[in-house]
Structures are given as C-alpha cells and as structure tokens.
Amino acid sequence: MKWMSLVFLCGLLAMAVASPLNPGNVIINGDCRHCNVRGG
C-alpha cells in the first residue's frame, strides 16, 4: 500500500505545480502551517 500513497502524493504534487490555487497552499519542504491540502 506504500506505492499507492507514493502515487497519490506524486499526483497531488503534479496537480499543485500545474495549477496552484494559492501559492501558500503548495507544500515544498513538508512544513505546511496554513494550507488546506488533504492528507498533508
């Protein structure tokens, strides 16, 4: 099941890079304080 989470995270990152809703919502270093990304 670990690969499923990896694929999900990669897809989420690709979506965030392709069309960012808010610059503050993109997780870069894993330290996200004020973003509303599910699972992050």
From Swiss-Prot:
Family to which the UniProt record says this protein belongs: Belongs to the bomanin family.
Gene Ontology, cellular component aspect: extracellular space
Keywords: Disulfide bond, Immunity, Innate immunity, Secreted, Signal
Signal peptide segment: 1-18
Source organism of this protein record: Drosophila melanogaster (Fruit fly)
Name this protein carries in UniProt: Bomanin Short 5
Classification lineage: Eukaryota, Metazoa, Ecdysozoa, Arthropoda, Hexapoda
UniProt record, GO biological process: defense response; innate immune response
Subcellular location: Secreted
Disulfide bonds: 32-35
